[in-house]
Regions:
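A conserved beta-strand-loop-helix scaffold within acyl/acetyltransferase catalytic domains
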Residues: 4-50, 54-67, 111-116, 130-144, ...
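A general structural signal for short secondary-structure boundary/capping elements
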Residues: 104-105, 194-197, 229-231, 349-351, ...
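Short, hydrophobic secondary-structure boundary micro-motifs
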Residues: 24-25, 108, 231, 350, ...
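Juxtamembrane/interface motifs at transmembrane-helix termini
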Residues: 75, 213-216, 336, 401-402
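Acyl-donor binding region in acyl/amide transferases
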Residues: 67-142, 253, 308-374
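Low-complexity, flexible helical/coil segments
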Residues: 4, 37-41, 92-94, 108-115, ...
């Protein structure tokens, strides 16, 4: 016999963090962070007669502009065993009660269920009234959350973790560590620096960025509960200079030894290689000397927001400077964040959405190339489902409004083009 339970926020979060289908987006502090963007939440829990919790759901609601209705979005929920049909149906019934009370035109869910083990769940959810929105590409704008993400297993020691990366990426990580960047956990006031980097990244890669209030809301709500950290990477000129000096001394010693060898092609080639190496190091020393003059205290090159819910870590947002990219700050940062997440109980590290194996001319190709070299596997989920409560409003909100918005964008583009011709 199933029944509703009255859980505290802590009890709800503990269940989410311990459940295999739990997710960051079902935590109560995540819901609180969404208040800034107009969402509010309600939640419920289901258990057995003994009072054991079997499932929970956090429901987000947002009012639809111009309509006296809301959308109910259970992001990465329900959190329960989907192979227990009675439990899922009971949870749907309660979700419908709450959704109708909030005048929702539909309930949208996108549970954290691997497609590989839950293909039958798609048919089951359709049989109880849900509409499956299809197995969309991971970068599709038709889904709120990406259906396909890249996830790395990180429950291993440092050596094994590094070894799990693709060969070329291992080399880049080692080089990044040697080149004098320092990765550290930053404080709330450093969000200003992060947002500046984010704007720079958005301009470079052609996407719109959020203002600082959004990131402050995330940090303020999730950080104190151990669900979020801000990381920054700083180039330390003095450390780089010291490292280059050691390298230069070694090259000069090797060059001196090579000069004393018997003449021959082998000697000539070795001297040539060492001379080229010495010249390159000399240029690097000059460059770092200039950097040191401009930034004597160091310069921030990149940053990221790392989130965690139980055994799952998430690379939420990343940003980097256009300057000094040859120091590979992102590679050093990712490695350190993976180690930090592991040391704090995470077993997996989610790099976020991708388009799987896109063609080279795809705008998503670079993202795929970056995310696939970290020992990651594609995590393919069952996708997004809608339960329609009020069909006319659903059709208007899900079809009519997007069509109107697209038409408005096209009209603005046309008017802009005509204006430019004058």
């Amino acid at each position: 016999m199933l029944k509703l339970l009255n859980l505290t926020e802590d009890e709800h979060d503990q269940f989410v963090e311990s459940h295999p289908h739990g997710d960051l987006l079902q935590l109560t502090d995540w819901a609180q962070s969404k208040h800034l963007t107009g969402w509010y939440s309600r939640r419920f829990a289901v258990g057995n007669e003994a009072g054991e919790t079997l499932g929970v759901a956090l429901l987000l609601f947002k009012k639809v502009p111009k309509l006296n209705h809301t959308l109910c979005y259970i992001s990465r929920g329900f959190v329960c065993d989907y192979h227990d049909p009675l439990l899922v149906e009971f949870m749907l019934k309660e979700a419908l009660n709450i959704a109708r009370d909030e005048k929702a035109y539909a309930i949208k869910i996108d549970p954290d269920l691997p497609l590989e083990t839950h293909r039958d769940t798609i048919e089951f959810l359709e049989s109880i009234g849900f509409r499956h929105r299809g197995l969309k590409d991971g970068m599709s704008k038709d889904n709120i959350q990406p259906r396909q993400t890249m996830v790395a297993s990180i429950d291993k020691d440092d050596k094994a973790l590094l070894q799990s990366f693709e060969r070329n990426n291992r080399t880049k990580v080692r080089n990044a560590i040697r080149r004098g960047t320092r990765v550290y956990r930053a404080e709330r006031e450093d969000l200003k620096t992060f947002v500046t980097l984010m704007k720079e990244t958005g301009q470079r890669d052609g996407f719109l960025t959020r203002d600082i209030t959004y990131f402050e809301s995330l940090y303020d709500n999730l950080h104190d509960n151990g669900h979020m950290e801000l990381f920054l990477v700083k180039l330390m000129p003095t450390e780089v200079a010291a490292s280059l000096e050691v390298d230069m001394e070694k090259v000069e010693r090797d060059l001196e030894k090579a000069m004393k060898k018997k003449d021959g092609s082998k000697k000539e080639n070795q001297i040539k290689d060492l001379s080229n190496r010495k010249e390159k190091l000399g240029k690097q020393q000059q460059e770092i000397e200039e950097i040191s003059k401009r930034h004597p205290e160091g310069v921030i090159l990149s940053g990221a927001l790392l989130a965690q819910a139980g055994h799952k870590a998430y690379y939420l947002y990343g940003a980097s400077s256009d300057q000094y990219r040859e120091y590979l700050p992102n590679h050093h940062m990712q490695y350190e964040m993976m180690k930090y997440a592991r040391d704090n109980g995470a077993r997996t590290y989610d790099f976020g959405g991708v388009s799987v194996s896109p063609p080279e001319d795809s705008p998503h190709f670079g993202l795929w190339q970056f995310k696939k070299v970290w020992g990651t596997q594609v995590s393919e989920k069952v996708g997004e489902f809608d339960y329609v409560i009020h069909r006319p409003f659903y059709t208007l909100a899900e079809v009519g409004v997007p069509m109107f918005q697209k038409g408005k964008v096209k009209l603005n583009q046309t008017l802009k083009a005509l204006k430019e011709r004058r």
